[in-house]
Amino acid sequence: MRRNRAAPAGTVHSLSVDSGVLKSNRLGDPTTRDVPVYVPHDHDGAGLPLLVDLAGFTSGGPAHAGWKNFGENLPQRLDRLIAEGAMPPSVVAMPDCFTRLGGNQYINSDAMGRWEDFLIDEMVPEVERRFGCGGEGRRGLFGKSSGGYGSIVHAMRRPDCWAAAACLSGDMAFELCYLPAMPGVLRTLAKKDGSIETFITDFEAGPKWSGGDIHSLMTLAMAATYDPDPDPDAFCGIRLPVDMETCEIIEERWTNWLSRDPVVMADSHAGNLKRLRALWIECGKADQYNLLYGARRLQRKLAAAGVEHVYEEFDDNHSGLDYRLDRCLPFLAKALD
């Protein structure tokens, strides 16, 4: 979709949030975070719903507001959808939650940092104070992949804050999306004498990274998120849920991972989702990370629990899915308007 230059352009404001809760992160990541905030044309934001955009792994909110080839960035997409009357005017915050390990799952972790607390207790209040938007019953969040994971988990855990959520190809059914990557991670680490620290420091110093390196880093980030090593001397708080020599699952650690799996969490948190005004879940039928099967499992559990939601499957994989926002953004904004 090429940009519709006839659509009146909104304004992207630059906001900076100095976090107190992120100071405990073990990665050495910055605690002052940029938050581009989109306000529609001819509005100052007052009285509008607030949507929060959670970026996928290796990305961050500011990237969604930047120049884009062959298509629209997020503000331009919002301009078009609002101008066409497809969605009501809404304020959209695009926080920078990028980390040393390449991304974020947007939950609290002793290693990665208290990202759930940052978003809910620090960023949202600052955006609402500055623009007069959102408020109880008028906040939603959306994201794809890691951002989709963050959206559904926030909705499960904090319906007191969020009234609507969209999970696009979110991480779930961990035994299908994460365990298959473990042998490759071990092979990568074996080239560094099994040292996680050496791999990461070499990655940071290197002029170029392979796709395999990125995927290995992503798996290490998941380890720091779902099962941070309690040993304060562990580099970046990372330990894997498998034996480094045999790739056998270490049950105690893997159980910690599974406790953060949305499919597992649905057993105890589905009731919270009933408090939402709107819930959207979708996944591509050719998703290369096997996320379709997790989405189907989650959908069945929610249906059995009587949770109202929209569930869609579509003919595509995990990549280049920004066009799917044309479906879920109007859905969220209308529910919050």
Regions found by a protein language model. Name each.
Residues 1-337:
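Non-catalytic cap/lid and distal C-terminal segments of serine-dependent acyl enzymes
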